[in-house]
Amino acid sequence: MPTINQLIRKERQKVVKKSKSPALVSCPQRRGVCTRVYTTTPKKPNSALRKVAKVRLTSGFEVISYIMGEGHNLQEHSIVLVRGGRIKDLPGVKYHIVRGALDTAGVANRTVSRSKYGTKRPKVKK
């Protein structure tokens, strides 16, 4: 515990909050261009082929972002919208690609949680 004199000489330092998505530079989303689209495998207890893309953002950063949902239409030079949010079992993947925005198509035949996957409301058959 510091004395009053010690506090007068050197005040307490504020705790600086570190951003979990520094490449977005305090923006909610950023536009970017896909430089590589590929699949990768998750960490130990899980097993899959997760779809990811390396994206060069308008902020100048190059990040790895996750393509969520079943199936996608992304390839090299696709323009995408990137948001924050990490994937726990993929090391180094701290961003998501927004489905249904710019060149990214929404998930086809999706009926539940459609807004997260950029899918329009299906036509009701009478």
From Swiss-Prot:
GO terms for cellular component: small ribosomal subunit. This is Small ribosomal subunit protein uS12. Belongs to the universal ribosomal protein uS12 family. Keywords: Methylation, Ribonucleoprotein, Ribosomal protein, RNA-binding, rRNA-binding, tRNA-binding. It comes from Sulfurimonas denitrificans (strain ATCC 33889 / DSM 1251). Part of the 30S ribosomal subunit. Contacts proteins S8 and S17. May interact with IF1 in the 30S initiation complex. GO terms for molecular function: rRNA binding; structural constituent of ribosome; tRNA binding. It comes from the Bacteria. GO terms for biological process: translation. The lineage of its organism: Bacteria, Pseudomonadati, Campylobacterota, Epsilonproteobacteria, Campylobacterales. With S4 and S5 plays an important role in translational accuracy. Interacts with and stabilizes bases of the 16S rRNA that are involved in tRNA selection in the A site and with the mRNA backbone. Located at the interface of the 30S and 50S subunits, it traverses the body of the 30S subunit contacting proteins on the other side and probably holding the rRNA structure together. The combined cluster of proteins S8, S12 and S17 appears to hold together the shoulder and platform of the 30S subunit. CDD domains: Ribosomal_S12. The keyword Ribosomal protein applies. The keyword tRNA-binding applies. The modification 3-methylthioaspartic acid is found at residue 89.
